[in-house]
């Protein structure tokens, strides 16, 4: 059971790490980017819709004291008949499915971190996880990006049960279950884990070392992201600082964000015509030229901000 908890935790926290690393905070506008209102909650209407659907930008992990719901969110859920996430949360509670996917955490071809790092880098990583009480012997075959996620703060599965940390996906799923709403996912857990296989393990290992070297700044970056989130700065959260950190996750922005956003659009179009649906996806996916809001508008839908400050 504890292994399954860690698996679910790793999936959630790794997606937070991806968004945090790929969408560095910056107030500098990028030429050609659509200007969007600061709002996490949006109404979606369009041809063939009998009722509006809704789009909500989440942050996958947030401190319990910082958790909030913008005005209108509960009303939007009440006016929806289905709730869709990036991943169907039923997958995250299906023990059989989780057990079958746990080997997807590991690198292919029996590769280990030791194969990817210089001796001094390997020692840095070993010492870091040893200080956390996690011998690297048990972790060195795990894909480095998952290990990078584990460096982000002092998160653990237990922090959810104590309320120290919250996940919007988990909280929204509870609401959906209480209302007996249909739930679904725009992707599968297997797909999200497989995304990391498209990033060379050498690049992942390099990012792990750099993340550990700057681990002291991790808490500050989380605080910056949380502040942006509470101010509903979706354009800022989606703005990629491409070129500022050469060799980082910015080089894989299309794999991690843009391509996934494009794949969601036809699914949202089809599902929203069937029934009014509340879509909860990472806020980093909403803004920008290749963000979900702009792509839905290009597909002929009307999106209206509902939660402006």
Across the structure, where does each feature detected by a protein language model lie?
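Residue-level detector of alpha-helix boundary/anchor positions
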Residues: 15-16, 34, 49, 273
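Generic short amphipathic/hydrophobic targeting helices enriched at N-termini
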Residues: 14-15, 58
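C-terminal motif of bacterial Sec signal peptides marking the signal peptidase cleavage site
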Residues: 18-21
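Structured, acidic catalytic/metal-binding patches in enzyme active sites
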Residues: 28-33, 41-248, 252
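Bacterial signal peptide processing site
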Residues: 23-25
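Bacterial N-terminal signal peptides that target proteins for export
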Residues: 1-11
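A cross-kingdom marker for long, charged
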Residues: 250-309
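Short, motif-level signal for alpha-helix interfacial/capping segments enriched in acidic residues
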Residues: 33-39, 259-260
């Amino acid at each position: 059971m504890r292994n399954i908890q860690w698996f679910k935790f790793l999936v959630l926290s790794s997606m937070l790490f991806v968004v945090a690393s790929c969408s560095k905070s910056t107030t500098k506008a990028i030429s050609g980017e659509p200007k969007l209102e600061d709002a996490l909650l949006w109404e979606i209407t369009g041809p063939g819709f009998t009722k509006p659907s809704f789009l909500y930008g989440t942050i996958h992990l947030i401190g319990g004291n910082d958790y909030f719901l913008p005005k209108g969110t509960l009303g939007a859920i009440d006016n929806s008949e289905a709730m869709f996430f990036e991943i169907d949360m039923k997958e995250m509670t299906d023990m059989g499915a989780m057990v079958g996917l746990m080997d997807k955490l590991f690198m292919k071809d029996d590769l280990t971190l030791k194969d990817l790092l210089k001796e001094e880098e390997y020692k840095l990583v070993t010492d870091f996880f040893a200080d956390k009480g996690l011998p690297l012997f048990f972790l060195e075959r795990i894909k480095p990006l998952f290990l990078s996620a584990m460096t982000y703060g002092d998160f653990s599965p237990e922090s959810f049960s104590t309320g120290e940390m919250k996940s919007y996906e988990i909280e929204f799923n509870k609401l959906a279950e209480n209302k007996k709403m249909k739930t679904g996912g725009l992707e599968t857990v297997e797909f999200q884990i497989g995304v990391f296989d498209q990033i060379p393990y050498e690049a992942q290992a390099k990012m792990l070392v750099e993340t550990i070297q700057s681990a002291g700044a991790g808490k500050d970056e989380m605080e910056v992201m949380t502040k942006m989130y509470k101010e509903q700065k979706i354009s800022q959260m989606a703005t990629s600082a491409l070129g500022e950190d050469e060799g980082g996750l910015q080089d894989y922005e299309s794999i991690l964000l843009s391509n996934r956003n494009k794949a969601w659009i036809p699914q949202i179009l089809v599902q929203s015509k069937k029934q009014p649906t509340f879509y909860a996806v990472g806020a980093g996916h909403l803004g920008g030229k290749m963000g979900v809001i702009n792509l839905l508008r290009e597909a002929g839908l009307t999106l209206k901000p509902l939660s402006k400050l």
